[in-house]
Amino acid sequence: MDVRRADERYPGGDEAAGIASRHAFSFGPHYDPDNLRFGALLACNEERLAPGAGFDEHPHSHTEIVTWVVEGELTHRDSAGHETVVRAGDVQRLSAAGGVRHVERNDAAVPLTFVQMWLAPQEPGGEPAYEIVRGIADSTPYAVPAAGAMLHVRRLAAGERTAVPDGAYVYVHVVCGGVRLGDAELGAGDAARVTGARGLTAVGVTDAALLVWEMGDV
């Protein structure tokens, strides 16, 4: 198990523009040839946007982009004609495929926090696609078949335990609270990268929320 602490993430964003970002993998100007991906996962970015802040229209291609809103509301508009407001507990997926442009903003009067994760598709190209799942339940894994991956959202009370899925590559990101994963204790913003995961259990040290990626061989 490879544990990465919250303070090891690369800082990003633009504080003057109301954007604070933390990147778990190489991203933008922060290049680390030894930290480009884990399994299909290319990025795990925690984004905090002040009211009125956001990312102007920008392009993506050949990427599966999955977003989970922690608090606040994320306004999304893209060149394929989708316009939605993504709220806390919602999962959003944008398949960039051969190419798409989008805007992401906090048009609400309260701060916005979301975790955005990028995955490499098994086959490049195709047509862009968009989906949103409102208030996804813990018992409902979210499949990203183009990347051979499955997202599990886990919300734990203190002392509660949950099985971590087995997989060739399993990535556990702690959104908030504290958990014990095997022999490791993880806090908010920490992550664990597990190769060949088998029989792992996560236990809430406090009330906690986790995002767990189950991925196959790449």
What are these regions (language model features)?
Residues 141-168:
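Strongly charged, low-complexity linkers/loops
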Residues 61-80, 88-91, 166-182, 188:
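Glycine- and acidic-residue-biased ligand/ion/polar-headgroup-sensing regions
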